[in-house]
Amino acid sequence: NPIENRLRFQSFSDSLKAMEQYVYKMDKPIARKPSKYYAMGVSAITPLADGSLLVLEREFYVPPMFMGSFVNCKIYQAWPSMPITHDKEITADETPVMDKFLLAEWKTNIGLFKRNIANYEGMCLGPQLADGSQVVVLVSDSQGQYANTLKDWFKTIVIK
């Protein structure tokens, strides 16, 4: 799947009334080989005080023999700036997309001697540090410790 998926983000008022919609364009996937299981998408969005969003993109690739499986995660800061109407087609090249800036990227995997694969699916803000940096807390989903391989992981990232 060499496609940069386009997603529709919906904003809401304080009373949960649907407001503006914005188009978010994901990065192209890094997996290039056939897979037994595959998933990619935005698994978490966290709003920031300035109106921008932290967006967690993740790609989960499992090859037929499981060895070489990986989860590639990226956190972007994205700015909703050009709303679209709910009936607007979002696949056209001229459709405005949100600006985004890469803040962090990491990869977990299953190797011959290392099994640290983690499918991060939750994200929230942690404390703000004395220097103004922001802690982001992430949590993975082990699917009930699937195949005795996946584990529950917590990860913290400091954004300067």
Regions found by a protein language model. Give the residues of each.
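Sequence/structural signature of beta-propeller domains
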Residues: 1-160
